[in-house]
């Protein structure tokens, strides 16, 4: 054998024995920059066979899927009899990984032995490597989490981003996903070398990965975009922080706190831009990989404090009893709240009803771009505020949006349109007024929002919700969830009013999108005076006035039922025809 052949054999042997070396060669062949320190550390963790059941979490854009696909090829090169199952939230994502694995095999000449041979499986979604023995299961198979998982056995299961916004936004969706991933136990070969590797970024505070860690014995290894910023964040990471980052941080925590972990990939300026784009909560989830956010003090607004009910469009009970027990939980509406934050209807309500008093349409205008023009229709009665409709429109205050808003005002018979004066000189009012008049005759009032938005929203909504004075029409919740879409028209729960409500904090920039929530808060601020009513006391006063008035009338025999409205309260009584001014006698 020639000297060059010897050198080549030594290099190949080194690559086969060292995944990091293999990664450097592959990155060079793909014309990618040299692997960064976090990518190298990630490769070392993947190659460590002692990690049998673990969750690899790394900030968005680090290339964890690419590195894992490279690891699959390297593993098959070392042991062609391995069976590897790749599962993703969608079949397209799983297939993309499978295609990339095949491309790696085709790209590197020294891997030519792994190319499928005649008679072996050789498709995008299922293929064998050349030296593999005939087997019921292919060497590599890709499948979506809702696809045909059964019928395959695997030495290594790689779950790559099985949790995405669309399958984790509601409690029902999260429970379904949890049921699906429990199938992995039946697919994994019962061997000491078998492994399950999750790759992912938390999508919600109730992330699947937290459940796996708490209830299924998985360990989590995290590469956040920044070193721990606070003592609390450092406590959360604890031993979850990647070993390399943990050693670096512990050596000099004061200097490293809040600095980029991989400045070659994302420097401070890059990460500041992403924090503005995602909002503080979104950045903490997707770049800091910290789902440990769901405490009542941080998130002051909870769905369980509101009353959800099917509402009459003309009148409502004068008083409700709120009791958040199991029998009052509503389970057939999409719930985007935090874990344990259920939707509840009322426990009981008054037999007396009254017609709604104030009716307003509140609008939070926006410019063009990612923001919506948020709106809410609010009614009041006896100290309660009723949310009858809410939503958002694109295109700022285009003619189409203004026409739709004017039609909403007519549909709900509002007495006043309230709008935020965030365009200076009442510009929105001047533009909207003539269009509104074409459809509906009502007053228009401008309201100026003051102070930091997040503080104002929380301070306005928290007392209303904690005293259970916000009543939400049930259809609002369903329509809000279905209409939550991003600028490209794709469903995005971050545009939902109730997602915004349950994720806002008093920190500046807490939400990337808050238009629908801001409209609701503006409306409740406008209606603040009506909230100061004591509903039970007012109901009693109205009834007392009715009785006092009728006690002054002469009594007669009663044979007929009559109905009247007094002080906004519907009253049913019996009276003789022709004695409308007389009191009843039994």
Swiss-Prot record:
Quote a single Gene Ontology cellular component term: viral terminase, large subunit
Name a GO molecular-function annotation.
ATP hydrolysis activity
Residues involved in Mg(2+) 2 binding: 364, 420
Which cofactors is this protein said to need?
A: Mg(2+)
The answer on whether this UniProt entry bears the keyword Protein biosynthesis reads no
UniProt KW keywords? ATP-binding, Endonuclease, Hydrolase, Magnesium, Metal-binding, Nuclease, Nucleotide-binding, Viral genome packaging, Viral release from host cell
Q: What is its EC number?
A: 3.6.4.-, 3.1.21.-
Walker B motif, short sequence motif: residues: 156-161
EC class of this enzyme? hydrolase
Region entry Involved in prohead binding: which residue ranges? 571-586
Ranges for the region named Nuclease activity are: 344-429
Q: Which GO terms describe its biological process?
A: chromosome organization; viral DNA genome packaging
Q: Where is this motif: Walker A motif?
A: 58-65
Pfam families documented for this protein: Terminase-T7_RNaseH-like
Entry's InterPro entries?
Gp19-like_virus, Gp19_RNaseH-like, P-loop_NTPase, Terminase_large_su_gp19
- Which annotated residues bind Mg(2+) 1? 364, 518
Start and end residues of each stretch annotated as ATPase activity: 1-229
Domain writeup: The ATPase region is in the N-terminus, whereas the nuclease region is in the central part. The C-terminus is involved in prohead binding.
Q: State whether it acts alone or in a complex, and with which partners, per the record.
A: Homopentamer. Interacts with the terminase small subunit; the active complex is probably heterooligomeric. Interacts with the portal protein.
The family assignment reads:
Belongs to the Teseptimavirus large terminase family.
**Any idea what job this protein has?**
The terminase large subunit acts as an ATP driven molecular motor necessary for viral DNA translocation into empty capsids and as an endonuclease that cuts the viral genome from the concetamer to initiate and to end a packaging reaction. The terminase lies at a unique vertex of the procapsid and is composed of two subunits, a small terminase subunit involved in viral DNA recognition (packaging sequence), and a large terminase subunit possessing endonucleolytic and ATPase activities. Both terminase subunits heterooligomerize and are docked on the portal protein to form the packaging machine.
HAMAP family to which the protein is assigned, alphabetical: TERL_T7 (MF_04147)
Name of the molecule in the record: Terminase, large subunit
């Amino acid at each position: 054998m020639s000297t060059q052949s010897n050198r080549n054999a030594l290099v190949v042997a080194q690559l086969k024995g060292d995944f990091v070396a293999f990664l450097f060669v592959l990155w060079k062949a793909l014309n990618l920059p040299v692997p960064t320190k976090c990518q190298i550390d990630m490769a070392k963790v993947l190659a460590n066979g002692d990690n049998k059941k673990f969750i690899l979490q790394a900030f968005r854009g680090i290339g964890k899927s690419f590195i894992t696909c490279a690891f699959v090829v390297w593993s098959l090169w070392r042991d062609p009899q391995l069976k590897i199952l790749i599962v993703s939230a969608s079949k397209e994502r799983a297939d993309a990984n499978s295609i990339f694995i095949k491309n790696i095999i085709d790209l590197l000449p020294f891997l030519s032995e792994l190319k499928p041979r005649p008679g072996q499986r050789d498709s995008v979604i299922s293929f064998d490597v050349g030296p593999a023995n005939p087997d019921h299961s292919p060497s590599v198979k890709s499948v979506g989490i809702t696809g045909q998982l059964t019928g395959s056995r695997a030495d290594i299961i790689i779950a790559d981003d099985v949790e995405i916004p669309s399958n984790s936004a509601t409690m029902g969706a999260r429970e379904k996903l949890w049921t699906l991933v429990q199938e992995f136990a039946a697919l994994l070969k019962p061997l000491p070398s078998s492994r399950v590797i999750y790759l992912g970024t938390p999508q919600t505070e109730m992330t699947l990965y937290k459940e796996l860690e708490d209830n299924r014995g998985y360990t989590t290894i995290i590469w956040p975009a920044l070193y721990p910023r606070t003592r609390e964040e450092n406590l959360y990471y604890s031993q979850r922080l990647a070993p390399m980052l943990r050693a670096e941080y512990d050596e000099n925590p004061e200097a490293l706190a809040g600095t980029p972990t991989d400045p070659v990939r994302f420097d401070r300026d890059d990460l500041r831009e992403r924090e503005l784009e995602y909002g503080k909560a979104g950045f903490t989830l997707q770049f800091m990989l910290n789902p440990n956010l769901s405490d009542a003090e941080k998130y002051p607004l909870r769905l369980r404090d509101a009353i959800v009910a099917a509402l009459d469009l003309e009148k409502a009970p004068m008083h409700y009893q709120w009791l958040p027990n199991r029998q009052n939980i509503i389970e057939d509406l999409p719930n985007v709240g935090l874990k344990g934050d259920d939707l509840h209807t009322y426990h009981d309500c008054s037999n007396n009803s009254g017609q709604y008093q104030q009716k307003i349409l509140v609008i939070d205008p926006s410019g063009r771009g990612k923001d919506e023009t948020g709106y809410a229709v609010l009614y009041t009665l006896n100290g309660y505020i009723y949310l009858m409709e809410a939503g958002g429109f694109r295109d700022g205050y285009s003619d189409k949006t203004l026409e739709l808003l004017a039609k909403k005002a007519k549909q709900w018979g509002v007495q006043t349109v309230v709008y935020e004066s965030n365009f200076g000189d009442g510009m929105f009012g001047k533009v909207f007024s003539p269009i509104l008049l074409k459809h509906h005759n009502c007053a228009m009032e401008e309201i100026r929002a003051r102070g930091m938005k997040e503080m104002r929203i929380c301070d306005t909504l928290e007392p209303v919700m904690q005293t259970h004075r916000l009543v939400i029409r049930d259809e609002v919740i369903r329509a809000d969830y279905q209409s939550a879409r991003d600028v490209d028209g794709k469903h995005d729960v971050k545009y939902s009013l109730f997602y915004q409500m349950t994720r806002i904090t008093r920190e500046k920039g807490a939400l990337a999108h808050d238009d629908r929530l801001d409209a609701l808060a503006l409306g409740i601020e406008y209606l603040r005076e009506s909230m100061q009513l004591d509903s039970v006391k007012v109901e009693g006063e109205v009834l007392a006035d009715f009785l006092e008035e009728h006690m002054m009338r002469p009594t007669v025999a009663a044979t007929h039922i009559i109905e009247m409205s007094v002080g906004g309260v519907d009253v049913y009584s019996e009276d003789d025809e022709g004695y409308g001014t007389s009191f009843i006698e039994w």
